[in-house]
């Protein structure tokens, strides 16, 4: 059994990690931290986990983390994880970081998108971007996994087979992402508090969302071409779920849709959590049918009149968009079955 710590275990992502790791046959969660709730039972904050954990939240301690863990999941805010990762690695611990602090390879992009000088550019080169569908081989044995968030995951998985297939007139894409209120975290703000989002469809960061940087990085890795993407998220009134609609323009108006569908299947062949959607009853991906699971549903539509193709992906933002994908990448890094702890069908109704 691998002894695992969750640092920042009181938020939605931390709670989802704890839910999944409770069902994982290869790990034992030995240390869970929260500054605000130290000393209190896990079930006080996560009542859904009542009976699954008999340990309390702890204050973070460098001495204790070294004694109690072999691998660490960091569910901390951006610009906070960066101060933990180097020392954890020096101590010989594996790190799965769910913040954005090690996702970008180019340190200059942190100045542009996050307005800070990255203090550990050498570690950026060593971090493996944690989408197993794209970086399966690189994740094997990885010591530092930079796990992406929901907007970037949904966009990348929708666009990846598109940019790979050489069917586009240009590589300037638009991603429209609709995402539920849990993306905003457990601490409500005016923009994320659910009563403020109910009955709303609200775009945000429309002038340029910072996740566009990692999306472009990954799509350029896949296509070997310069890719530019405009990523505009929209806050909607669901609690869970994210739907990405990625628009591109075709090089020709005679695309064989059956052949392209086969190319998508081939691109994701062997990946346990990708489901390619095509049919008459539910022809396009819908987050409603992946809630509670680590699946991503992929589909597409072509409007030949204007030469446009739209790729769709639907995920649960707390699962494939956060905790589920982090556990999946951890599994690959350790040589476990990719779906260990994740063999969960979606909820219905949800």
UniProtKB/Swiss-Prot annotation:
The keyword rRNA-binding does not apply. NADP(+) binds at residues 10-13, 317. This is [LysW]-L-2-aminoadipate/[LysW]-L-glutamate phosphate reductase. It comes from Sulfolobus acidocaldarius (strain ATCC 33909 / DSM 639 / JCM 8929 / NBRC 15157 / NCIMB 11770). GO terms for biological process: arginine biosynthetic process via ornithine; L-arginine biosynthetic process; lysine biosynthetic process via aminoadipic acid. Keywords: Amino-acid biosynthesis, Arginine biosynthesis, Cytoplasm, Lysine biosynthesis, NADP, Oxidoreductase. It is found in: Cytoplasm. HAMAP family: ArgC_type1, LysY. One of its GO terms (cellular component) is cytoplasm.
């Amino acid at each position: 059994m691998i002894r695992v710590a969750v640092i920042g275990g009181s938020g939605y992502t931390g709670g989802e990690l704890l839910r999944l790791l409770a069902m994982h046959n290869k790990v034992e969660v030995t240390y869970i931290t929260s500054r605000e709730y130290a000393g209190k039972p896990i079930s006080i904050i996560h009542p859904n986990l009542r009976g699954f954990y008999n340990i309390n939240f702890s204050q973070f301690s460098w001495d204790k983390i070294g004694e109690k863990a072999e691998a660490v999941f960091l569910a901390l805010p951006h610009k906070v994880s960066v101060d933990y990762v180097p020392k954890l690695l020096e101590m010989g611990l594996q790190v799965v970081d769910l913040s954005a602090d090690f996702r970008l390879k180019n340190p200059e992009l942190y100045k542009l998108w996050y307005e800070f000088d990255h203090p550990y550019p050498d570690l950026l080169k060593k971090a493996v971007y944690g989408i197993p569908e794209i970086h399966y081989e690189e994740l094997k044995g990885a010591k530092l996994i930079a796990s992406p968030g929901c907007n970037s995951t949904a966009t990348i998985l929708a666009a990846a087979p598109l940019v790979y297939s050489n069917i586009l007139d240009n590589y300037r894409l638009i991603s429209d992402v609709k995402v539920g209120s849990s993306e905003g975290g457990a601490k409500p703000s005016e923009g994320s508090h659910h009563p403020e989002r109910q009955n709303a469809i609200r775009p945000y960061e429309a002038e340029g969302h910072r996740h566009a940087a990692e999306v472009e990085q990954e799509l350029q890795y896949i296509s070997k071409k310069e890719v530019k993407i405009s990523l505009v998220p929209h806050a909607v009134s669901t609690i869970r779920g994210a739907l990405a609609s990625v628009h591109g323009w075709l090089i020709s108006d005679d695309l064989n849709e059956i052949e392209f569908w086969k190319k998508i299947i081939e691109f994701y062949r062997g990946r346990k959590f990708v489901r390619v959607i095509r049919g008459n009853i539910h022809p396009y991906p819908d987050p409603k049918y992946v809630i509670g699971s680590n699946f991503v549903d992929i589909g597409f539509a072509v409007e030949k009149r204007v030469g446009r193709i739209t790729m769709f992906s639907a995920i649960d933002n707390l699962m494939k968009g956060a905790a589920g994908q982090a556990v999946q990448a951890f599994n690959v890094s350790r040589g476990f079955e990719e779906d260990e702890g994740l063999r969960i069908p979606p909820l219905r109704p949800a």
